[in-house]
Design a protein with these regions (language model features):
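Surface-exposed, polar/charged faces of alpha-helical domains
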Residues: 24, 43-46, 50-54, 83-87, ...
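Short leucine-rich amphipathic alpha-helices used at interfaces
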Residues: 47, 53-54, 59-61, 65-67, ...
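Short beta-strand edge/turn micro-motifs at domain boundaries
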Residues: 143-171
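Low-complexity, intrinsically disordered terminal/linker segments enriched in charged
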Residues: 161-209
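Early exported N-terminus immediately downstream of N-terminal targeting peptides
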Residues: 23-104
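N-terminal signal peptide c-region/cleavage motif recognized by signal peptidases
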Residues: 15-18
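Surface-exposed, charged secondary-structure patches
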Residues: 102-144, 196-209
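Bacterial N-terminal signal peptides that target proteins for export
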Residues: 1-8
Length: 209
């Protein structure tokens, strides 16, 4: 239950805003996005029923555009990122993005009226990296801190990491990825991610038949 709460709350904070992202401060962006996705879930009966295709479409359209996956992949890969070729880096980012689609889609299926409470933003004008702090609250459960690490890019503010209870979401993959690289190399990691993503796509396709 605790993992479902934390992951679902991550999704709830990242839907598409009603105005261009670059016009909003980072905290206003995340707050606006959370309201947008809540409204989408509440009016879409297919999402509420757990329709995989509809949920994946919501994730693709409203959540993923607000992530810097290259930055997230660099954190997850650690020192191994420097060893990867440009082509391998591109493949890693693509497969990691697909992996997170699955994570967020699963979280949306388990949404149960969690609430986000935002903290005042501590940042200076001109800062290119900021932390948007919040807490996830649910009846009968302990509040969980959730901090969004964001950076300003030419296309607006992007999330590159989320810290849940102080633990980096991107860094949670680091040990697994490092072990895979030790055992099978970077190509082995890419193949492993690709295989898992294909298996998930096949399962989702069978559900939609």
């Amino acid at each position: 239950m605790r993992n479902t709460l934390k992951t679902a709350a991550l999704v709830l904070a990242l839907a598409a805003p009603t105005s261009p992202a670059e016009e909003l401060t980072p905290d206003a962006l995340v707050r606006t996005l959370s309201l947008e996705v809540l409204a989408t879930i509440r009016r879409d009966k297919d999402i509420q029923a757990g329709n995989p295709k509809r949920i994946a479409s919501l994730v693709e359209a409203k959540i993923l555009p607000h992530f810097d996956f290259a930055h997230t992949a660099r954190i997850a890969m650690g020192a191994n990122w420097r060893r990867a070729s440009p082509e391998q880096r591109e493949q890693l980012v693509r497969e990691f993005r697909t992996l997170l689609v699955r994570t967020y889609s699963s979280a949306l299926m388990n949404y149960r009226d969690q609430v986000l409470e935002f903290k005042p933003l501590r940042a200076q004008p001109g800062d290119a990296q900021v932390t948007v702090r919040s807490e996830v609250r649910q009846s009968g459960a302990q509040a969980v801190s959730m901090d969004y690490e964001m950076e300003k890019t030419p296309s607006g503010w992007k999330v590159y990491d989320v810290k849940i209870g102080g633990a980096s979401l991107a860094a949670t993959y680091r040990d697994t990825f490092a072990e895979e690289v030790r055992n099978h190399g970077i190509e082995g990691l890419i193949d492993s991610l690709s295989s898992k993503n294909r298996q998930n796509d096949a399962r989702r396709a069978s559900i939609n038949i």
